[in-house]
Amino acid sequence: MNENLIKEALYQKYIEPTKKKRESYIGIEIEMPILNLDKKPVDFAIIHKITDRFMEHFQFHEQGRDEEGNIYAATDEVYGDILSYDCSYNNLELSMGKEKELFALQKRFSSYYSFLQKELQKYHYTLTGMGVNPYRIYNRNVPIPNGRYRMLFHHLNSYKNYQLPMYFHEYPEYGTFSSASQVQLDVDYDDLIPTLRAFSRVEPIKAVLFSNSVLLDEHEELLCCRDMFWENCTHGINPHNVGMFECDLESEEDLLAYIESTSIYCLERDGKYINSPPIRIMEYFQQPVVEGELRKMFNYRQLPSFVDEDQLYELVENVLKIAEEGLKDRGFGEEILLQPLFDRMKNRTNPAKQLLEMKEQGTGLEDIILEYSLLQ
């Protein structure tokens, strides 16, 4: 295939949409582990019943069914909110439709979460706000039975087939017991590169404030082991597919060149997914037939020796103050939502550190789970 056609297709997909005049919105996705407090596997039949009750109560509509006929995704047609299960029925996700105000998202999320908790508690189940399911050893860590997740599971389990000078962890099923959150923002063309540069620069600060993925009793030195799961699996064979940008983007040409250097490992054809070893995009279409990161260091409980902790938290405070001013300028009173982060900065902690401190002080794991299940 002609190289210029490939470049143009990538431009149309990733750059051109930012040129359309539109209002600015925010979207949020939050994944949470489901736990059986009896320390037994989560019964997926119970999860399917709760999904049905949720859909009836909030008038959500079916969006996706697995190969066994069970609903794994449902959507609200008014706001665009989605209830789904990510990778496994052990991992629930609430994706909030776009809004201008954070409080509107917070209100709907709280309503959904409270309903789900009430239903789960009938079976001695709970959601909790931990990034790694602390009861993963009791669960059936199997993928949702559909083409997409079966393809992903196969890809992650193929790490044993590679003889590469990189470290592969031995948790290919990590998607079934680890959770994440995402934020989506509308960005205009003129702000695209400055925004990507800015977000790259705050990644280490995010690690300091938000780390929340402790693999209890195994890798407790890591406060955000989910990054290790993501980067040291088959997704990370090409480092441009994971982590931060390895270069400082200066232009849209730099961004496109970076996108061109990423790899694909599957394709969908006639409704079916086909796996392949990771291959760079440009190389794929040319077939005859179709430096270290500071963020990684801040994922550890122990800061590197060259980091001055006082200066680090002074930087964290300055970044939070910039965020506070930005929210004040929006005029919705949303700056109050930053107070927990100012508290973390003041106490030099984050959810992962707090979890480990509670454990070391003798707090029982179930008590920690319930503490992390509370809406703040």
How should each PLM-predicted stretch be described?
Residues 1-93, 97-98, 174, 190-197, ...:
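C-terminal accessory/tail domains of diverse enzymes
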Residues 95-106, 184-186:
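The substrate-binding groove and active-site-proximal loops of carbohydrate-active enzymes
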Residues 108-113, 316-319:
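Well-ordered, non-membrane alpha-helical segments in soluble/globular domains
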Residues 116, 120-138:
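Carboxylate/His-rich catalytic cores and anion/metal-binding grooves
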Residues 131, 185-189:
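Short, structured patches in soluble enzyme cores that scaffold and shape functional sites
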Residues 140-154, 226-237:
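Short, low-order "capping/linker" segments at domain edges
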Residues 175-181:
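Short, conserved phosphate-binding/catalytic loop or strand-edge motifs used
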